[in-house]
A protein has these predicted regions:
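Conserved N-terminal structural module of periplasmic/extracytoplasmic solute-binding proteins
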Residues: 3-8, 13-104, 122-123, 260, ...
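Periplasmic-binding protein-like
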Residues: 51, 156, 191, 329-351
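Pocket-flanking alpha-helical
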Residues: 76-113, 123-142, 152-153, 158, ...
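Hinge/lid segment of periplasmic solute-binding proteins
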Residues: 97-151, 207-210, 214, 292-297, ...
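Extracytoplasmic/periplasmic solute-binding protein
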Residues: 137-145, 150, 177-229, 270
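A bilobed periplasmic-binding-protein/Venus flytrap-type ligand-binding module shared by bacterial periplasmic
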Residues: 153-156, 307-320
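Glycine-centered hinge/linker elements that transmit conformational signals in sensory
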Residues: 180-187, 220-258, 284, 296
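Long, aromatic- and glycine/proline-rich binding clefts that accommodate carbohydrate-like moieties
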Residues: 291-294, 342-400, 424-432
Length: 432
């Protein structure tokens, strides 16, 4: 963590220098009474940026006396820049956070609780996964316009060819034994035997988001969630080792396509793709009448899946928290939620918007994703300031496991390093 901290400090000094030297730095309120609201967002897909920019314009027009200055920050650099701004005391009024990284900012004391700023009717309409993600130490600190979906996309024709059962919901998910048998049968009918895409071409947080549900489905986890003080005995227990041994076995058996061009499923090289909602549009275009969405396999304690995505919070240094809350409330109106969901394909963040959604409504092709979030199948990543250390260690462990290193040894080392980080930070005591 030392190298990260040094990087944040350097960026913070640069930000402080820029602020001190800028003679044109704007005040929060202009002479004509217009309130200037600073908003930071991640520079995601172009369609997302265009929708958010249009939302900012509509909000400013409706409010009349609020000028929203929207700044997009590259996604890869986002967390580092926000952390640097926090150290420099230069956070904007409103800003996004990537899912579980939220809790470290809360712990540092940078965010305001939202429960007294947002309408109660709006909060009660949020998906339970959204409020779970945004709640820390019994306070709501963030809300999301959308959430994510994680599952298995499949070609129905390939499954029919081997007589595979088609689960229609998480309760009917394939057992791990059944899934292993399906992989074997698919491989027998495939020339190169590669039948599963795990998006090994992805990087970073994908591996924690995409594969920690394997642990939870097996009865293990990344950390003991009772007090978030120990990974030992949880991340490296026998259930965790057995679960991730299955994953290593898939790779060793040659079932997993490395998918270097990110086109294995689209091109028909594999029958199954373990991925999130964002792949749907391309997959549907490639297989318009042959595409299925299925739950992840059950490793013994029920099918589990991931949750969490970008979410909005208000900085403690904001001079206009009520106006900031009005802006967030505007983004969470049904029409605006649907505009963003239609742009990025994600699960709408409110129940009202889900019901009006073409893809996620009762008869929508992606309804499984919404059901998983509303029915408790999805698992939030650990709600602890230690999460940056946890995910870094799990990502390292995943890479070692995929390359054949002993699973038990790898998980032992990861658990030890996570616990050492927690110890080094005095257990991450309650928010300052």
């Amino acid at each position: 963590m030392t190298r990260q901290i040094n990087t944040y400090l350097i960026l913070a000094l640069l930000l402080m220098g820029i602020g001190a030297c800028d003679p044109n730095a704007e005040e929060d309120t202009s002479q004509n009474g217009t309130i200037r609201l600073q908003v930071w967002a991640h520079a995601g897909q172009q369609a997302e940026r265009e929708v958010l920019q249009s939302q900012v314009t509509r909000f400013s027009q409706q409010s009349g006396d609020v000028d929203v200055k929207l700044t997009f920050i590259p996604e890869r650099d986002y967390n580092a820049q926000v952390q640097a701004a926090a150290i420099a005391g230069d956070l904007p009024d409103v800003l996004e956070f990537d899912g579980p990284y939220l809790y470290n900012y809360i712990w540092q004391g940078h965010l305001l609780p939202l429960e007294n700023l947002l309408p109660s009717t709006l909060v009660s309409d949020l998906l339970p996964s959204i409020t779970t993600q945004g709640t820390y130490d019994q306070h709501l600190y963030s809300v999301g316009v959308f959430d994510s979906g994680l599952g298995l996309f499949a070609r129905k024709s390939a499954l029919d060819a081997i007589g595979a059962r088609i689960p229609s919901n998480a309760a009917e998910a394939w057992s791990i034994a059944e899934f292993n048998q399906i992989l074997s049968k698919l491989a027998e009918q495939d020339q190169d035997r590669m039948v599963l895409d795990l998006k090994l071409n992805y990087r970073g947080e994908w591996f924690s988001y995409g594969f920690s549900p394997i642990l939870q489905s097996a009865g293990a986890d990344l950390i003991d969630r009772r007090d978030y003080q120990n990974s030992q005995g949880v991340l490296n227990n026998p259930a965790a080792v057995a679960a991730l041994q299955h994953l290593q076995d898939w790779i060793t058996a040659g079932y997993v396509d490395p998918n270097l061009d990110d086109a294995a499923f689209v091109n028909g090289q594999v029958a199954l793709s373990w991925v999130g909602h964002w792949a749907y549009a391309d997959y549907k275009q490639a297989w318009p009448s042959d595409l299925l969405l299925l739950p992840l396999p059950d490793f013994g304690h029920g099918s589990k899946t991931g949750q969490g995505s970008w979410n909005w919070g208000i900085s403690r240094t904001s001079h206009h928290p009520s106006v900031a809350a009005q802006f967030i409330s505007f983004l969470l109106s049904v029409d605006e939620v649907l505009r963003m969901s239609n742009a990025n394909g994600a699960v709408p963040g409110t129940r009202s918007a889900v019901q009006r959604s073409l893809h996620y409504g009762d008869d929508g092709e992606l309804r499984l994703f919404a059901d998983q979030l509303m029915q408790g199948v999805s698992m939030p990543r650990p709600k602890t300031p230690a999460y940056p250390a946890i995910t870094a260690e799990f990502q390292k462990a995943f890479q070692q496991i995929r390359h054949g290193v002993d699973v038990s040894q790898v998980l032992d080392q990861a658990a030890q390093r996570i616990d050492q980080d927690i110890k080094d930070n005095q257990g991450y005591p309650a928010a300052r």
